[in-house]
Structure formats: C-alpha cells, structure tokens
Amino acid sequence: IPILLDFYNDDNQISTVMHPILRDVAAAVGDKGKVIKINVDKNNELAEALRIKMLPTLMIYKSGEMVWRQSGEQDADTLINLIKEFI
C-alpha cells in the first residue's frame, strides 16, 4: 500500500491550503493507499532525519522505500495519479 506523507506546520500558509486537498486525495484512494499528515513542530527529529527544509514536503513510500518526494503545493489530481501508479 502506498503511503503519502505530508510534512507541514500550522504557521505555513501553503500547508494550510493543502489540508482539504489531502482530504480529497485520501477519499479518492480509499483503502488502496494512506495519507498521513506529520506536524514538523511536534516531530522535529523525524523532520531533521528526512532533511525537511521546505513546507509542505510530500513523500510517497511503498514497501518501506521512498518512491517520490516533492516540496510545495500540489493539486489533488496529480497526487491521486501518483499514488495510483504505486498501487
């Protein structure tokens, strides 16, 4: 199952804009994928380990391997299609 990780914080305007987009993505992929939001302020060590420099940063993991990574705003259709590639 592909997992989309969204690294964000509440002070970042683009991160806030992404919240409803990620809800749409989660609804579209259903049980064939997962969307997990990670607040970098509460998970600082993880953010540092993954070298999160820009918010939001989105990653897709499949079978424990990172298969895609992008920083900045993405639209729902792009994210849905990316996740479907890894189903």
Name each model-derived stretch:
Residues 15-16:
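Conserved phosphotransfer microenvironments
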